[in-house]
Amino acid sequence: MAAPLEAQDQAPGEGEGLLIVKVEDSSWEQESAQHEDGRDSEACRQRFRQFCYGDVHGPHEAFSQLWELCCRWLRPELRTKEQILELLVLEQFLTVLPGEIQGWVREQHPGSGEEAVALVEDLQKQPVKAWRQDVPSEEAEPEAAGRGSQATGPPPTVGARRRPSVPQEQHSHSAQPPALLKEGRPGETTDTCFVSGVHGPVALGDIPFYFSREEWGTLDPAQRDLFWDIKRENSRNTTLGFGLKGQSEKSLLQEMVPVVPGQTGSDVTVSWSPEEAEAWESENRPRAALGPVVGARRGRPPTRRRQFRDLAAEKPHSCGQCGKRFRWGSDLARHQRTHTGEKPHKCPECDKSFRSSSDLVRHQGVHTGEKPFSCSECGKSFSRSAYLADHQRIHTGEKPFGCSDCGKSFSLRSYLLDHRRVHTGERPFGCGECDKSFKQRAHLIAHQSLHAKMAQPVG
């Protein structure tokens, strides 16, 4: 009986040993699975961010694919709302970091917002040269020194990285080198396409090629605009951390015909900071005549319309009477009529005059009876949208105008102005008969009716 008991006593130990091995094995498998999931999640994030509408057929398929990619990235079936929010905030946090800090932090692959913040704080404590300057290898330095002419453009940023020399095999098939040079860290993989008139692959991440002032002058305005559109769009996508894979972006780059004369495959390219790119763009981009241009998407270079709006923000037109400034001469002319009393716009129905044509148009609604603004709740119509907005507060109960003295709220601004006279004691409506004053016009009218009755003969 003792032997079986000893066997029973030893059995749990052996079982525990087996269990320990299984637990460790399971833990290793979980870590491996998490690593694979992390890589798959990052790939889905990049595919989600660079998804192109033109890659699918129709809006339904586009929305479905975006939904699937987003779910694969964020994994809502596994993560809580807080974890999903942290992923989104972490991505945006990395996006808004300065370029050099952003690149270094992305290389560390932070898994949480706290980790990313800690990396940035640690980086800021280090000497600037320790992380901003990328020291080339001993073999690459003399090779770079023996290359041809330097790239034309703004000076390189501190820590600008040089792409290693293009292997000779890439040039063996043709005497003409690629017009665009690769730029970035060694070992990066970038999508390539073929540019019209250029032999050999050209990386879509290689838009920072450069023009001298003479070469820039040979480009027509359309080519210059296309250059800046592609360059800025590529810069935005590079900042977000993914390449350009959409066919629409590839076809856009293929339209970039001009190749820099005299530029060879041995030219050295350097990266720009956003500030230097903006400065060089402002110097080299011509002050062309401002025409109608479609509004730009976020992240695209400023359009002529935006430039025109920026120039107008200076408000060069000043009123000689009160000193008020205006962006446009027409606004100044309209304003000056408040000083002169001029009313050039006359109503053909009643000969009433108005300072602006818009006031005349609103007045003519009185004669036509037109009331184009209808309330969806009760069907009541109004001649002005402002009247409709005031009326709709009856249904919603909204009272947006509050008194700063007592906190009472009102649905109309005029009601608030009448109420404030209770606090200020103002009585702007005076009677011409007895010099009595009133806070509201209605009270004055009621008072004047008393004078009218008293003036009537008693009969």
UniProtKB/Swiss-Prot annotation:
Residues 45-126 form the SCAN box domain. A zinc finger (C2H2-type) spans 317-339, 345-367, 373-395, 401-423, 429-451. One of its GO terms (molecular function) is DNA-binding transcription factor activity, RNA polymerase II-specific. One of its GO terms (cellular component) is nucleus. SUPFAM superfamilies: beta-beta-alpha zinc fingers, KRAB domain (Kruppel-associated box), Retrovirus capsid dimerization domain-like. It comes from the Eukaryota. Residues 128-188 are annotated as: Disordered. SMART domains: KRAB, SCAN, ZnF_C2H2. Its main location: nucleus. GO terms for biological process: regulation of transcription by RNA polymerase II. Widely expressed with highest levels in testis. Residues 202-292 form the KRAB domain. InterPro entries: C2H2-ZF_Transcription_Reg, KRAB, KRAB_dom_sf, SCAN_dom, SCAN_sf, Znf_C2H2_sf, Znf_C2H2_type. Keywords: DNA-binding, Metal-binding, Nucleus, Repeat, Transcription, Transcription regulation, Zinc, Zinc-finger. It is found in: Nucleus. PANTHER family: ODD-SKIPPED - RELATED, ZINC FINGER PROTEIN 208-LIKE. Belongs to the krueppel C2H2-type zinc-finger protein family. May be involved in transcriptional regulation. This is Zinc finger protein 213. It comes from Homo sapiens. The gene is ZNF213.
